[in-house]
Each structure stands twice: as C-alpha cells, then as structure tokens.
Amino acid sequence: MSILAINKSKIATNVWFDDNKMYVSLEDGRELSIPIDWFPSLRDATEKQRNNWRFIGNGEGIHWEDLDEDILVENLL
C-alpha cells in the first residue's frame, strides 16, 4: 500500500485584521482565521501597529517591527 503525501504551501500572501481575528492568506488559496487573543502583543496593539507588518523569509513568517513580534506561518497551521 502506498501513502500519498500532499505538500501544502506554508507561504503567506496577505495579512489583515478585524476586531477579534487575524486573517492570513496562503499561496495555495487557503485562508487562516486566528483569534488575536492567542497573541497578546497583537491583541493589545493599536490598529496602526497591527497593520505595520512585513513578510519575513519570503512569506514563511510575519514580522511586526513596532511590536517586536514574529510569527511563523507553519505555527498557525
């Protein structure tokens, strides 16, 4: 018997927020919805601070300079 393993992308293409969640779009079309309560620095940040992010590692992670916060996409899966 053979086992088929599907390699899913762990590369982010976009990040946005509402009042309670962070959303992350992935290269393969998936969208993640993550409670910002999981990340106290994001939860307590201003809208301006939350929106001041950039990708690191070609989309493998997200960095917030103002908050000194890094999140790896694979840790959200």
Where are these regions (language model features)?
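Motif-centric detector for short Cys/His coordination patterns
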Residues: 1-77
